[in-house]
Swiss-Prot record:
Keywords: DNA-binding, Mitochondrion, Phosphoprotein, Repeat, Transcription, Transcription regulation, Transcription termination, Transit peptide
Protein name as annotated: Transcription termination factor 1, mitochondrial
SMART domains: Mterf
Source organism per UniProt: Rattus norvegicus
Modified how: Is a phosphoprotein. While the DNA-binding activity is unaffected by the phosphorylation/dephosphorylation state, only the phosphorylated form of the protein is active for termination activity. Functioning seems to be regulated by phosphorylation.
Subcellular location: Mitochondrion
Transit peptide: 1-37
Amino acid sequence: MASRNIWRVRRNFLFDLRGWVPQYSAEVFLKSIPFRPFSVECNSKDGENGDLLNNLLTMGVDVDMARRRQPGVFNKAVTNEQELKMFLLSKGASDKVIGSIISRYPRAITRTPESLSKRWDLWREIMASDLEIVNILERSPESFFRSNNNLNLENNIKFLCSVGLTHKCLCRLLTSAPRTFSNSLNLNKQMVEFLQETGISLGHNNPTDFVRKIISKNPSILIQSTKRVKTNIEFLQSTFNLDKEDLLLLICGPGARILDLSNDCTKRNYTNIKKRLLSLGCTEEEVQKFVLSYLNMIFLSEKKFNDKIDCLLEEKISTSQILENPRVLDSSIHTLKTRIRELAHAGYDVSTSSIALLSWSQRRYEAKLKRLSG
């Protein structure tokens, strides 16, 4: 009878705790060691919470990635991964998305359900649906989980509304530069005040409208330093010899996009553009006019700019054609080569005709190609 009882004890027992179904043998049972509600094997390091690691593995979290990003989370005795999972599932997130969010920003599991709910409600004041927020979290989990200071978030929303930002602009900010709302309120105030002062100094008669224009053109500007933005404004003014009126028009328009670019990157890329075009026989005035006509080219690294110029020159396209059509530099080298080849096959010679269609949208280009091909 005793041996039969022991045999029964040696059978595996199934427990269903918090959704897990691990198995335990008699050796564990007879030693009176408390059962752990996890069965996934993992290699925990000293000081790490083994149960947490097993739990995260079961949830599809890339533990190695999470360790590299925020190792301290795994030493915490109390975490809220199950509560986080249930909360995000209720908002429409999939298991795969939840695993990805925690893998890239493991600190998310330290947020309480109450804090998550409050923060979500504040975001919903701006976004139209839960799914839109889930999409932002999937792309940038840090933007939502980086801070649990919901009062700061609420104050930022109120402040940005008070300076004239529309609901549409706030929505774009949250979508494109969500870290804006995790900034301290003082940081956002400093940037807005700096922009207002800049607008006034350049002769803008409505500083609030100036701020709104800059932010709508460049949502990322609020997460940059005032020093960086100021240096880029000074660079534009000195490089292109602009008076206040022209500078104002530039930074309220296409120039707004480069205000948050690294100062070193701005100068290095422009220096390369200038050097390359001068080597092709352009004058300094032509270089300035070329860059001002399409400032986006300043985002091109030295290699990308030079490779695209080389590609165009190899196809017998002249420097003057490039100067007249700076937007062709927006297209990838693959697109440029493919279109030039297709146009040649259709009897269109880019060396003697307009090259503007090299930068057209795919739909517009295909319609043109169809007409050329008869």
